[in-house]
Every structure is written in C-alpha cells, then in structure tokens.
C-alpha cells in the first residue's frame, strides 16, 4: 500500500465534503467550489502530493463516472433523442475539432498534428462536468437529457479520434484503408464489449438477491467493460457507457427489489468520490502551471476558438432538425452552447499526447487553462442562464413542434 498516497487522498476527500456542504449553503455549483479549493490548496507551503496522471484519470476515475452517468439515464428518453444527440456528437465533434485545429495552426502557428490533437481532445464536452452541473441545477428533463446524452456520446467519439491521431503522431502512417476500419472497430467494438459484459453480469445478477453482491457485480461491469475494450483497442468510454445504459435500462428485470435502490445509491457515492478527486486535482494542477503561460496568447485564442467551434457545432446542426420531432427550441440551443463544459477527459487525453509532438507541453498547459475557464466561468454562470431561460424544473418546457406535413 506504500505506493498509494492514502493520507493525501483522505485529506482531499475531507476538503471535498466541506466544499459540498459549503456549496449547498451558498447555492454555488459544487464542481466550481472543488476547482477553487484545489487551486488554493496547491498554493499552501505543504500541499497534498497526488499527481494527476493520464492513467489515474482514464483508467481509475473515468470508468465509474461514465458508467454512473449512463446508469442514471432514462433509457426511453435516451433512445427517443438518439437521432439528434448522435448527430450532435459525431458531426459536432468533427466541426468543433476542425475549427479549433485550423485556428491553432494558422493563428498560433502550431504544427498540423499538434493543432489537430488539441482540436479533437478539446472538442468533446465532458460528461463529468456537464452532468454534475445539470443535476445540481435541476434543469428541465428534456434539456438535461439532450445535454447529458450528447456529452456522453461525443466523449467516446473524441477519444476514438484522438487515438487515431496519436498513432499518426507516434510515427505510424496508416492509409484510409487502415484508418476507417480501426475507427469503426473502436466505436463498434466499444459498444459490443459493453453490451456483452453487461448482459453477462445481468445473467449472474438474476441469480442472487444479495444487494452487496449486486453492487459488486455492477462494479465489475463498469471497470471490466472499460478495460476489456481498451485491451482490444476499442473505446473503453463507449464500452462503459453501453454497459451503464444496458444495466440502467434492463437491470430492473434482474436486480432484486432491495438491490435496485442500493445499487443506484452505491453508484451515486462512487461518482461523488471520483468527482471530488477529479476536480480538486484539476484545481491543484492549474495552480502548478507556469503563471505566464496561463495568460498566454495561445490560451486566450484557444478559449475563443473553443467557443466558436461549439457554436458552429450546435446552431447549424440544430437548425437541420427545426422541422422534425427533434426540434430544439432556441433556449435549448443556448444551453447546449454554454453548457458544453470541458473537464477530466480533455486533460487525460492531453497528458497522453506522444512526446514526438513538438507542442506537447504547450497543449497540456492550454488544455488546463481552457478547462479552468470552462468550469469557473461557464460552470459558475450556468445556473443563472438556466433561470434566465426558464428551464429550471417547475417551469413548463417549450413545446416541441410536430413534423411539417408534406405539401
């Protein structure tokens, strides 16, 4: 156990509990409080030493967060919005990545591969940040579903695109005949592993009525699906997402009466622990970045490009659905735009950039600055926007127009 910094982690979790209590009393977003607390902790003469690594984020903290988010989704609502959220996730990530990559290359002068890697890693909104924020605010059901679903899906899309670009940056020179199958396998394989693992787990769960066993088995589903997919070069994020959706959507048929509530409660607790560590560590690491680079021209340009890319990936795509059953009211579009928070995934991918990329250090610093802006500025103002747009629970949701009839 000597390799695990138990005392520092315990200290950070104690701070997280105090921040949770204080944030609720002050009516501030919890994740904003965590980042600020982490920043202040890092300025202390003797702060807890818990390094924020790619492996810690990607292999330890992300699987339970993605799984829990998918587990809590309403399967019927998710399926109903899937045509819309799929387009926003796939096309949206591509548009945002192109905007950011082009800007960082032509304006800042980064190499194409460095700009492309940054464009992809920062294009996806982070489900951890988005879902934590929206649950706290009590946003209306449909806008929450669209934002959360799109965030979960584009998470997986961005991770797959990043893996392809990383292979190129590391020296591989795959042609289209290799890239396309690899991309499709990463997507399809991730979903396949998630479905297979979750169904196998549910078959075992159906043979017990012990809630503790049920919780343990769902824990194996979360990490097992993620690690298995990664082992076979598929998307672990999509695998954990698929497993969570399957267990959340069909688990009621297999879980015992006592197990249903306890499984969900256990996963809310796991997510609280992972969320707490992720955002405190983000704050600590932002404080440890070189001060001059935090306000550099590259960081400012990146923030502006990220916002521009997000806008171009939301408003035109939403317009394409304006005469369909998936029409998004303007208030929803504004919420999707400003609610596109960045977080742990962007940092995990930035830390995984190959050393052969000349801008690697600059990309890491710029990613930290962009994430900090996203959480502190966008996250802090989201509750006000939700209230302003009258999208909080208790207000009537805007009506969805029926498809226009032909002729």
Q: What is the meaning of each model-derived region?
A:
Residues 1-407:
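Transmembrane helical cores of multi-pass secondary ion antiporters/exchangers
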């Amino acid at each position: 156990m000597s390799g695990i910094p138990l005392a520092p982690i315990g200290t950070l979790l104690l701070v997280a509990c105090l921040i949770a209590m204080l944030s609720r009393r002050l009516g501030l977003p919890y994740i904003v409080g965590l980042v600020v607390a982490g920043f202040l902790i890092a300025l202390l003469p003797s702060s807890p030493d818990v390094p924020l690594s790619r492996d810690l984020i990607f292999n330890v903290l992300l699987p339970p967060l993605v799984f829990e988010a998918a587990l809590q989704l309403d399967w019927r609502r998710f399926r109903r919005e899937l045509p819309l959220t799929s387009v926003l996730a796939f096309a949206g990530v591509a548009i945002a990545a192109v905007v950011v990559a082009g800007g960082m290359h032509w304006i800042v002068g980064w190499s194409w591969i460095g700009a492309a890697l940054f464009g992809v890693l920062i294009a996806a909104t982070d489900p951890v940040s988005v879902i934590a924020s929206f649950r706290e605010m009590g946003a209306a059901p449909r806008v929450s579903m669209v934002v959360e679903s799109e965030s979960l899906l584009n998470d997986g899309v961005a991770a797959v695109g990043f893996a392809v670009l990383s292979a190129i940056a590391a020296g591989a020179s795959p042609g289209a005949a290799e890239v396309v199958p690899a991309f499709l396998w990463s997507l399809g394989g991730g979903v396949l592993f998630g479905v297979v693992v979750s169904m196998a787990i549910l078959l075992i769960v159906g043979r017990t009525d012990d809630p503790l066993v049920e919780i343990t088995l769902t824990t194996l589903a979360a990490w097992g699906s993620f690690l298995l997919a990664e082992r076979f070069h598929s998307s672990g994020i999509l695998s954990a997402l698929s497993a969570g959706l399957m267990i959340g959507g069909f688990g009621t048929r297999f879980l015992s009466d006592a197990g249903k509530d306890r499984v969900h409660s256990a996963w809310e607790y796991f997510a609280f622990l992972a969320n707490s560590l992720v955002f405190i560590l983000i704050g600590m690491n932002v404080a440890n970045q070189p001060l001059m680079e935090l306000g550099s021209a590259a960081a400012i340009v990146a923030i502006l490009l990220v916002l521009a890319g997000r806008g171009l990936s939301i408003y035109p795509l939403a317009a394409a659905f304006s005469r369909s059953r998936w029409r998004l009211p303007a208030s929803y579009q504004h919420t999707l735009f400003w609610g596109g928070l960045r977080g742990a995934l962007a940092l995990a991918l930035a830390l995984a950039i190959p050393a052969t990329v000349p801008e690697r250090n600059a990309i890491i610093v710029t990613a930290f600055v962009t994430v900090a802006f996203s959480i502190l500025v966008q996250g802090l103002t989201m509750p006000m926007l939700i209230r302003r747009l009258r999208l909080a629970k208790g207000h009537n949701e805007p009506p969805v127009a029926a498809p226009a009839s032909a002729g």
